[in-house]
């Protein structure tokens, strides 16, 4: 999208940031008027979560915050599919990967405390 002059005579780059005084984003400009000179306020503009960055009173821009990369699989399932099971052992036979734990010694019970 090209740059178009906004109401303040500045240029609105709608692909990277949202100028709140631009006619395209005018419904959100009311939020900017309420916020005033806030440094960073969470906001949602056209479904994009961002921060209102306001170094001065005007203009106020919203810079979209990057979202984490989405994986088609649920977390943890990628490890299951990345490491296929080893079928060298017959079913029902376990092969422990760690040495067995030492036996626990039961301590005698102490008398009731008074």
Curated annotation (Swiss-Prot):
<feature type="short sequence motif" description="PTAP/PSAP motif">
    <location>
        <begin position="96"/>
        <end position="99"/>
    </location>
</feature>
<keyword id="KW-0899">Viral immunoevasion</keyword>
<dbReference type="GO" id="GO:0020002">
    <property type="term" value="C:host cell plasma membrane"/>
</dbReference>
<feature type="region of interest" description="Hydrophobic">
    <location>
        <begin position="6"/>
        <end position="22"/>
    </location>
</feature>
<feature type="modified residue" description="Phosphoserine; by host">
    <location>
        <position position="71"/>
    </location>
</feature>
<keyword id="KW-1032">Host cell membrane</keyword>
<feature type="region of interest" description="Hydrophobic">
    <location>
        <begin position="33"/>
        <end position="53"/>
    </location>
</feature>
<keyword id="KW-0946">Virion</keyword>
<feature type="region of interest" description="Interaction with host SRC, HCK, FYN, PIK3R3 and GRB2">
    <location>
        <begin position="95"/>
        <end position="104"/>
    </location>
</feature>
<protein>
    <recommendedName>
        <fullName>Protein ORF3</fullName>
    </recommendedName>
</protein>
<keyword id="KW-1038">Host endoplasmic reticulum</keyword>
<dbReference type="GO" id="GO:0044167">
    <property type="term" value="C:host cell endoplasmic reticulum membrane"/>
</dbReference>
<keyword id="KW-1090">Inhibition of host innate immune response by virus</keyword>
<dbReference type="GO" id="GO:0044163">
    <property type="term" value="C:host cytoskeleton"/>
</dbReference>
<feature type="region of interest" description="Disordered">
    <location>
        <begin position="91"/>
        <end position="114"/>
    </location>
</feature>
<comment type="function">
    <text>Small multifunctional phosphoprotein involved in virion morphogenesis, egress and counteracting host innate immunity. Plays critical roles in the final steps of viral release by interacting with host TSG101, a member of the vacuolar protein-sorting pathway and using other cellular host proteins involved in vesicle formation pathway. Also acts as a viroporin and forms ion conductive pores allowing viral particle release. Impairs the generation of type I interferon by down-regulating host TLR3 and TLR7 as well as their downstream signaling pathways.</text>
</comment>
<dbReference type="GO" id="GO:0016020">
    <property type="term" value="C:membrane"/>
</dbReference>
<feature type="region of interest" description="Interaction with host HPX">
    <location>
        <begin position="28"/>
        <end position="68"/>
    </location>
</feature>
<feature type="region of interest" description="Homodimerization, and interaction with host AMBP/bikunin">
    <location>
        <begin position="72"/>
        <end position="114"/>
    </location>
</feature>
<comment type="similarity">
    <text>Belongs to the hepevirus ORF3 protein family.</text>
</comment>
<dbReference type="InterPro" id="IPR003384">
    <property type="entry name" value="HEV_Orf2"/>
</dbReference>
<comment type="subunit">
    <text>Forms homooligomers. Interacts with host SRC, HCK, FYN, PIK3R3 and GRB2 (via SH3 domain); binding does not activate the kinases. Interacts with host AMBP/bikunin and AMBP/alpha-1-microglobulin peptides. Interacts with host HPX/hemopexin. Interacts (when phosphorylated) with capsid protein ORF2. Interacts with host TSG101; this interaction plays a role in viral release from the host cell. Interacts with host SIRPA; this interaction down-regulates the phosphorylation of host IRF3.</text>
</comment>
<dbReference type="GO" id="GO:0044423">
    <property type="term" value="C:virion component"/>
</dbReference>
<dbReference type="GO" id="GO:0052170">
    <property type="term" value="P:symbiont-mediated suppression of host innate immune response"/>
</dbReference>
<keyword id="KW-0945">Host-virus interaction</keyword>
<keyword id="KW-1035">Host cytoplasm</keyword>
<dbReference type="Pfam" id="PF02444">
    <property type="entry name" value="HEV_ORF1"/>
</dbReference>
<keyword id="KW-1043">Host membrane</keyword>
<keyword id="KW-1037">Host cytoskeleton</keyword>
<keyword id="KW-0472">Membrane</keyword>
<feature type="region of interest" description="Interaction with the capsid protein">
    <location>
        <begin position="48"/>
        <end position="72"/>
    </location>
</feature>
<keyword id="KW-0449">Lipoprotein</keyword>
<keyword id="KW-0597">Phosphoprotein</keyword>
